Amino acid sequence: MLEILYQDPWLVAVNKPAGWLVHRSWLDRDEKVVVMQTVRDQIGQHVFTAHRLDRPTSGVLLMGLSSEAGRRLAQQFEQHHIRKRYHAIVRGWLIDDAVLDYPLVEERDKIADKFAREDKAPQPAVTQYRGLATVEMAVPTGRYPTTRYGLVELEPKTGRKHQLRRHLAHLRHPIIGDSKHGDLRQNRSAAEHFACRRLMLHASRLELTHPFTGQPLIIQAGLDETWMQVLTQFGWRGLLPDNERVEFTAASRQDETHLT
């Protein structure tokens, strides 16, 4: 069962696990684990998507319980009236508090987008980011005897495909576990030494005006076990108090960590 973060007569929000598709497409119509169908079966109602999260990303996913609710939510997302906050663990020490305004060329899928225009101009893409913590671990990566990581808070101001992943890669601080835009040696090292085998990007919080009641609404999603183990091993527990979970302990994974 999926964790229900919020539900009322109009909306439902869940904590999407990493690795789950939001909905099926013709490319993955045989996929058995899909958020929309799982939520529908779980609450006994059809749900309507208003935004999406990449398959490897975890966190808050908000849906409507009617087509009208889905439409109103989608409009708020399109007009950037919903504030989104993410957290990521990245390569290196990213300590800035800044805004990156870096247009992105549309990222096309070779199969799904084979009929799309190839001459599209880069689209505006803006991300606010803030470094929260850094650490240097005594594990080698490539030719370096130690490995540096950073904990970063992100607020996308636009909604381009893979925007956060591509923007952080542009800053030379790719997200750990990003197989497409990241550092494969860093990914292998994080998997080997810290049991970190997922994209370390989490949609932590949505802040919006309820599209039916007009009241302020804040929805937050807790971190999964992998995130909690890494925060513990890096000495970062307590830095994300709204998202950390007390039920996950590091004992089982700490025994597997081999620092040199």
From Swiss-Prot:
Active site: D54
Catalytic activity annotation: uridine(65) in tRNA = pseudouridine(65) in tRNA
InterPro entries xref list: PsdUridine_synth_cat_dom_sf (IPR020103), PsdUridine_synth_RluA-like_CS (IPR006224), PsdUridine_synth_RsuA/RluA (IPR006145), RluA_PseudoU_synthase (IPR050188)
SUPFAM superfamilies in the record: Pseudouridine synthase
GO molecular function: RNA binding; tRNA pseudouridine(65) synthase activity
Alphabetical GO biological process terms: enzyme-directed rRNA pseudouridine synthesis; tRNA processing
EC number: 5.4.99.26
Broad class of enzyme this protein falls into: isomerase
This protein's UniProt keywords: Isomerase, tRNA processing
UniProt key word Transit peptide: no
One Pfam entry name: PseudoU_synth_2
Function: Responsible for synthesis of pseudouridine from uracil-65 in transfer RNAs.
Family named by the database record: Belongs to the pseudouridine synthase RluA family.
Protein name in UniProt: tRNA pseudouridine synthase C
